[in-house]
Amino acid sequence: MNRLQTIDADTLQSTAYEPVSFVVDDLLPQGLHLLAGAPKIGKSWLALWLCLCAAQGKPLWTFATRPCEVLYLCLEDSFQRIQSRLFDLTEDAPPTLHFAVMSQQLHNGLVEQIEQFLKEHPQTRLIVIDTLQRIRAAGNDANPYASDYRDIGVLKALADKHRIAILLIHHLRKMNDDDPMNMISGTTGLSGATDSNFVLRKSQRRENTATLYCTGRDIPYRELALEFDGEDHVWKLLSDNCEQTEHPSERILFLLSELLRRQPEISAPAKVLLEKIDPAGAEGLTPNSFSHRIRKSVDALRRNGITVSFRKSNGDRLICLKRADGVDDLTTENIVTIDPDNPPCFGV
């Protein structure tokens, strides 16, 4: 009998895991995602522009990206049509954006084809499959939910294994629903097993405006009002109902930068760090919410020269912060481990 592989809560909280990485900041993280919309609504234009932005490292609307290799499986198009669309978007597409118009099916060689591509192009971080139905075999399954969940599970395992984002282009039901997510074609085995779901929906078929509904495990729910520019062939952002004056990661970066200005490396419990950076409590943070903010901001902090790790010492969970520009000069004297019962004053 194979025993259950378990981990106790204390060990789990003390284990360092790589933070979730984003292809498009705050919008498209690593994992498996669905983009659904009615036929001919402009899903493929949006998908192609997303691929182009990710390959070039240019922002998608207000959301930052970093240059990476991208694979777009355009299984309902020809290379000629893709070329035409690409020229409509840019005269200078990068060689890191790759296309294919034919592939094997999901349970008959596709995974192996993608694995081989990733081996040849290890900097790939985004794969778009347009459409999901093109890679699925004709189903006569007595349990469509199980079939949907099984197919999605294979693709999710592939995305998780390689820490990449896979975006599946899919269709909507014809029946309207107050909840756009309920309009995704198929059973909840599809939408429930993905990491994020996006629905592109027009209120009227002939309109050039639409709303992109976004929900997921690693992103906040948001509704993006979009308008399709027929000349540039780009969906342009009109508004974002999730806009904030300052992103939480930016605030955490500012607070920790101030703390690390005099000491390039500090280790302390969340409560002590919070007392040092916000003694008056103006930020409205608790030690738990402060620690949570830092964990959610690890990737953003690392990109801005602050590395974060976590460890236990004498029963306390310590947040370990290191400023990158002090790495060359770090000695044991620079490392400050704060005693929670007798913390020093840093004067920040």
Regions found by a protein language model. Name each.
Residues 2-4, 10-12, 17-19, 23-24, ...:
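Conserved inter-motif catalytic segment of the P-loop NTP-binding fold
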Residues 46, 50:
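Hydrophobic positions on the alpha1 helix immediately C-terminal to the Walker A/P-loop
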Residues 55:
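Gly/Ala-rich phosphate-binding loop of Rossmann-like dinucleotide-binding domains
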Residues 88-96, 187-191, 301:
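Short, conserved catalytic or adaptor-binding loops enriched in Gly and charged residues
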Residues 226-348:
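DNA transaction DNA-binding modules
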Residues 78, 82, 106, 110, ...:
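Helical mechanochemical/support elements of P-loop NTPase systems and associated helical scaffolds
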Residues 29-33, 68:
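Pre-Walker A (Motif I) flank of P-loop NTPase domains
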Residues 19, 34-36, 40, 44-45, ...:
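Phosphate-binding/switch region of NTP-binding enzymes
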